[in-house]
């Protein structure tokens, strides 16, 4: 197993056990430079409670969570009874949707896997502002600001979260330490499995706020964790995006970094 290299700065960003200190690894910047991308990658190793990033300043800067918010939204839906259980089917009303893969009946896992925005907008509407606000405070999720509409505050409203806060939230979920039932946390964790390789298991979720412009770019996310043998690695990546053709980079850049660290891949 390779170790994180070229750590040059230590900064206290949080009081939590996982991200109490984070180190800057400038060697990762070559992956961003190669694609002419502005972004950040935070990678934390559970056993050593150590974290690294290519950009200390951006690691703590908050952005729209976009569809990464489906993770807490699903837990809140289960906790409030809006989602009955993991077997509940969300019926398609037959009306055209932005993506063809959303135009069908979906289970919770299916809705997460295809990132079905209409399903989670309906969940949020049924949860309502009061309960939504209560749970975001319980979860210490981002700036906890749900202004901008109950069914879009995470897409174009005022909710913001940093890459560091993302990994903190994911660690709490992994350890079943969120203020939610263990059963509901397990349901969502299972729904987040995106890769099951012989040597490792990836739980993850992407997010995309839209492309924006060159002067005011959107944000693209990939967050999650990797279980490998007895180790767990939590990660959060975000990048500025002004052209949809760059969207695959939200996964390819962090994948290359994790491959170079010996976490995933061959």
Swiss-Prot record:
A single cellular component GO annotation: plasma membrane
UniProt-reported outcome of changing residue 117 to L: Slightly increases catalytic efficiency, about 4-fold, with respect to carbapenems. Decreases catalytic efficiency, about 10-fold, with respect to some cephalosporins, but about 80-fold, with respect to cefotaxime
Impact after mutating residue 157 to D: Increases resistance to ceftazidime about 15-fold in P.aeruginosa strains PA01 and PA14. Increases resistance to ceftazidime about 30-fold in P.aeruginosa strains PA01 and PA14
Record-listed E.C. numbers: 3.5.2.6
InterPro entries for this protein: Bact_Transpept/Beta-Lactamase, Beta-lactam/transpept-like, Beta-lactam_class-D_AS, PCN-bd_Tpept
Modified residue annotations for N6-carboxylysine: 70
Gene Ontology annotations of biological process type: antibiotic catabolic process; cell wall organization; response to antibiotic
Cell location: Periplasm
Enzyme active site: 67
Reaction(s) the record says it catalyses: a beta-lactam + H2O = a substituted beta-amino acid
KW Disulfide bond (keyword) present: yes
GO molecular function: beta-lactamase activity; penicillin binding
Activity regulation field: Activated, with respect to most beta-lactam substrates, in the presence of 0.05 M sodium bicarbonate.
Superkingdom as given in the UniProt entry: Bacteria
Annotated S-S bridges: 44-51
Alphabetical keyword list: Antibiotic resistance, Disulfide bond, Hydrolase, Periplasm, Plasmid, Signal, Transposable element
pH-linked activity: Optimum pH is between 6 and 7.
Signal peptide as annotated in the record: 1-19
Positions of a beta-lactam binding: 115, 206, 208, 250
Annotated family: Belongs to the class-D beta-lactamase family.
Record note on quaternary structure: Dimer.
Annotated function: Class D beta-lactamase which confers resistance to the beta-lactam antibiotics, including penicillin, carbenicillin and oxacillin, and also some cephalosporins. Confers weak resistance to some carbapenems, in E.coli strain C600Z1. Acts via hydrolysis of the beta-lactam ring. Has penicillin- and cephalosporin-hydrolyzing activities.
The protein's name: Beta-lactamase OXA-10
Organism field: Pseudomonas aeruginosa
UniProt lineage: Bacteria, Pseudomonadati, Pseudomonadota, Gammaproteobacteria, Pseudomonadales
Protein's gene: OXA-10
